Amino acid sequence: TATSTVTLTERYLTPKDFQVNLELCKADFEQDWLAIEQGFSSFDEVPKSFANYLIGHVASKVASKMEQTIWTGADGNAGEFDGLVVLALADADVIDVAGVSAGAGGIDASNIIAELGKVVDAIPATIYGNEGLSIYISQADARSYVRAQATLGYKDLYHVGQTEMDFEGIKLFVANGLVSGTIVAGEKDNLMFGTSLQSDMNEVRILDLANVDGSQNVRVIMRFSATVNYAIGAELVLYQLSA
């Protein structure tokens, strides 16, 4: 016989469909790419290495945008879904930390240590000390932290060498999708990225239109779906600048 109750809640991953459809002209690349691959020639077939280059180029652009969307995306914006920061702002369970005033200049090397201290103080006991716990910071705030460590004379190296991205035993993870003044702390297992199929994020097609319409164009097509969420809001800390 049960002597207590358990309340269950659910959070969903609902992937959003995206598509990339670019059309490029091979003539723009002939002098600096095709000439290297096949010598001076009037043949316009796309060499395999050029196709690989296009795939890598487009994939890197998509990855950069996806990184930003994962953290600060908004579903109302074209090509985005609600990112982790937007979801956390709407969740009363998430632990909010008011940071230094944006009007005072936000985070810099002079206050980054104190502001990270506020984040650590807010981390709940249920996850503090866990191996998967990380503090996610922007690239700009990471630079401020490195400079602050140098000023403090890290390992007597000062401005020489590389600073460990660690704060009071907690790993600092540089998330390029975050903006300066926004910091997230939580376990990596609490953060979820989902697609409709495991292979969705690496499907790219190259279509050479020379055999279709006789043009010198190449079409790069990518279709995928993605979204993010977290499991337990009460085990997530969100730091933002004060007004």
Feature map (PLM): residue ranges:
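Ordered core of a single globular domain
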Residues: 113-151
